[in-house]
A protein has these predicted regions:
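Short SAM/SAH-binding signature in class I
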Residues: 87-95
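Conserved SAM-binding loop of SAM-dependent methyltransferases across substrates and taxa
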Residues: 29-42
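Conserved class I S-adenosyl-L-methionine
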Residues: 19-28
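Conserved Rossmann-like nucleotide-cofactor binding loop
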Residues: 53
Length: 228
């Protein structure tokens, strides 16, 4: 079978090192591992899925792809899908909340010693995930942002290392702040618009709540205007 990958997952695929042994957590239909093998970019993969329906769908797709000898589909929760003996070098976790991704990593962090790269694609709470990476000895070496079906997705590529981030970098992303892509600006301009609507609904007498929202708006404007 030939997999038509969404642009969101194609962007993730660009960060997978050639020759990697991949674990794709929450693999759903196993589209990403199949695509990477079709392109000759990885040597093997584990497709981990915790829900029975998507697990069975992944099994069927792997069978149709002819990659049964290269992709092992496992019904397991998070990093429980692999053991050190699997020699996984790269882990992808995509399309989940940042807090959930952090919880998945935390539950299996003892297994991360031999893993070279994490490729993470949260769709919210990105700051929670960056904090987890800081606290657990990972450095974000690359970031990107894209939009698909009206949602914004950030990609974080992390490897073992030391990282110190400012409060703004934790919230907005150290590389994304520097790059200031059009999508990044659109995401945060939309957030300003939401906050301004919220501000308009707060009575003038409620100065505490108004000041909190005004501070958030000011911080975003500073980032978009390159004020450190």
């Amino acid at each position: 079978m030939y997999v038509q990958l969404s642009q969101r997952l194609k962007d993730v695929a660009t960060y997978v090192p050639k020759g990697a042994k991949l674990l794709d957590v929450g693999s759903d239909h196993a589209y990403l591992p199949i695509y990477l093998l079709e392109k000759g970019l990885i040597t093997s993969a584990i497709a981990g899925e915790v829900v029975k329906g998507p697990y069975e769908s992944a099994l069927a797709n792997v069978s149709a792809s002819g990659f049964q000898d290269k992709i092992d589909v496992r019904l397991a929760n998070g990093l429980a899908a692999f053991e050190p003996a699997d020699e996984v070098t790269t882990i992808t976790i995509c399309g989940m909340g940042g807090r959930l991704i952090a919880d998945i990593l935390d539950a299996g962090k003892d297994k991360l010693t031999g893993v070279d790269r994490l490729i993470l694609q949260p769709n919210n709470r990105e700051d929670d995930l960056r904090i987890w990476l800081i606290e657990n000895g990972f450095e974000i070496i690359a970031e990107s942002i894209m939009t698909e079906n009206g949602k914004y997705y950030e990609i974080m590529v992390a490897e073992s290392g030391h990282m110190s981030l400012s409060d703004k970098e934790v919230r907005f992303g150290p590389h994304l702040m520097k790059d200031q892509s059009q999508v990044f600006q659109l995401k945060w301009q939309r957030e300003i618009n939401k906050l301004e609507i919220a501000l308009g609904s707060i009575p003038l007498a409620n100065q505490t709540d108004r000041a909190a929202i005004e501070d958030k708006i000011q911080t975003i404007k500073e980032v978009l205007n390159h004020v450190s």
